[in-house]
Amino acid sequence: MKSPAPSRPQKMALIPACIFLCFAALSVQAEETSVTPQPPDILLGPLFNDVQNAKLFPDQKTFADAVPNSDPLMILADYRMQQNQSGFDLRHFVNVNFTLPKEGEKYVPPEGQSLREHIDGLWPVLTRSTENTEKWDSLLPLPKPYVVPGGRFREVYYWDSYFTMLGLAESGHWDKVADMVANFAHEIDTYGHIPNGNRSYYLSRSQPPFFALMVELLAQHEGDAALKQYLPQMQKEYAYWMDGVENLQAGQQEKRVVKLQDGTLLNRYWDDRDTPRPESWVEDIATAKSNPNRPATEIYRDLRSAAASGWDFSSRWMDNPQQLNTLRTTSIVPVDLNSLMFKMEKILARASKAAGDNAMANQYETLANARQKGIEKYLWNDQQGWYADYDLKSHKVRNQLTAAALFPLYVNAAAKDRASKMATATKTHLLQPGGLNTTSVKSGQQWDAPNGWAPLQWVATEGLQNYGQKEVAMDISWHFLTNVQHTYDREKKLVEKYDVSATGTGGGGGEYPLQDGFGWTNGVTLKMLDLICPKEQPCDNVPATRPLSESTTQPVKQKEAEPTP
C-alpha cells in the first residue's frame, strides 16, 4: 500500500478542526460533571504505604480493596498516634479499622457437566450487583448487574467484558449484555471515560477501547436503536482518547494522543498518575528501585500504562525482555490500540448516519481513513512482513511479532496482501499445539511465551477469517479449544490463560497466581465451539476428532526466546 501523499498532513490538520473542538467541549463537560473518588493510597497516605510494605497479605490487592470502617482521616490520625507506642500491632490495627474483602465461596460445579453446561452455569455465579457501596470503598457503584472475570478479580474489567459479552450473547443472555453496556455508558457519563475497572484506584487509566464494539454487538440484537442510544457516550469516549489533540504540534505527544512529524494522528496507552499502583504497591516500588538510572516516576507511569494496555506485562514494552524496569510503554505506539481507534471511528460514523447526521458521519469516516493510512505507513514492518508497534524514540517500526499484529485484520483495516503475509507469519511464528502464542519471547512475564490468552485467540481467528484465511483461523480455534477441553477434563474449570506449548496446562508468570472462572475464556470458548461445529450439529464439548477437514496445518516448532529489538 502506498504511503500517504506529502500534501495530506496539511489537509488532515483542517479535517479534525471542528470535530476536535467539539470533543474538547465534551471532555471538559465530562470533567465538570465527574465526581472522582480518591484511591486508597491517597486517602490513607503513610498508613497505606506501611501496610503494603509490611506485606500483611499475600496479595497486595487485598488491602487496596479493604473498606475503612470510619473516616480515613480519623483512622490515619489514630495510626499516627499509636504507631510508635510499644506493643503496637499493625495487623490488629488493620483488622479493627477495616473490613477486608471476603473470600468468595468456592463454586463446586455439578458433576458430569459438559463444557458448555459448565460455562452456562457459571454466568450467574460470576454476576455481581453493586448499586450502592460504602462511602470510602474503593469499589465504584454501577446501576446494573455485571459479570466479573473470576478469581481475585472482584470487579468488572473493561476489555475483559467485551469477550465475556460475546459468550453471554451466545448463551442468549442479551439482558446481561444490555446491562453491561448501560454500566459502561454510566461510567463514561460519570467519570468521562471507562476506567480499567470499577475501583477508585483504576480511575487514572482506561483499557483497550472496546465500548463501541460492545454497542455494535448489542445492535445485533436491538438494531440501530442501540447505536443511536449510545452515540453520545461513544463520542465522549472518543473525546477522552483524543484529549489534547487540538494543541499538538508535529512530533509531540499529549496524554493518549501522538502527532507524528507528518501530522499523522495515532494513540498510545497512558495513565494520569506516576506513582506505584495500589494493587501492586510493593512490586512497583521494587521494580523502580532496581533501575536507579531512571526516575522512579517514569517507571511507575510506564508500569501503569502497561496495565492500561491490558498486557501487564510483556517484552513488547521492554528494551530488555528479562528486565521489567526497562519497559517504556508510553514511548510505544501500539498496533492493537490504533486498530481499535479505527474501529471506533467507523462505528461512530455508522451511528452518526443512523442518527441522521450525515455530515458528522463523513467526518468520522475521514478520520478513520486517515488513521488507516497511518496504520499502514507506521505500523507495518515491511522487512519482517507483519504489523508491529511504532517506537517514538527510534522513530521506526519495531521488529517484534506479537499477537497484537492480528488486530488490523480483526477490524478490517489491513491491506489484502498484508493480511496474507500475516497469515504466514502467524502460522510460522505464533501457532502452537495449544493455541496462539502471545509473543515468541520467554521473559517470565504473563503476556509472553508460552502463554496464550482467549481474547487474542478470538481476535486472530476473526481477523484471519475476515480476509479469507480460514485454514489458519480454524487451526488456532481447534488448538486452543483442545487445550481448554483438556484442562477442563482434568481440573473442571476454565482459567485466565493457558500454556500453549502443549495442551491441558494453565499459564504461568506474572504478578499473581493463575485465576479460574474465567469470563473471557468462557466467552471465547462458546464462540469457538459454535465456529468449529456445524449449526445443525452443535457441540457441548470439544469433539475428540476435528469436525472440519479443510485444514491439516501443523504448527511450526517455535524458536527459543528472541530478544526484543
From Swiss-Prot:
The keyword Cell inner membrane does not apply. Pfam families: Trehalase. Its main location: periplasm. GO terms for cellular component: periplasmic space. Residues 1-30 form the signal peptide. One of its GO terms (molecular function) is alpha,alpha-trehalase activity. The active site is at 312 (proton donor/acceptor), 496 (proton donor/acceptor). Belongs to the glycosyl hydrolase 37 family. HAMAP family: Peripl_trehalase. Monomer. This is Periplasmic trehalase. The lineage of its organism: Bacteria, Pseudomonadati, Pseudomonadota, Gammaproteobacteria, Enterobacterales.
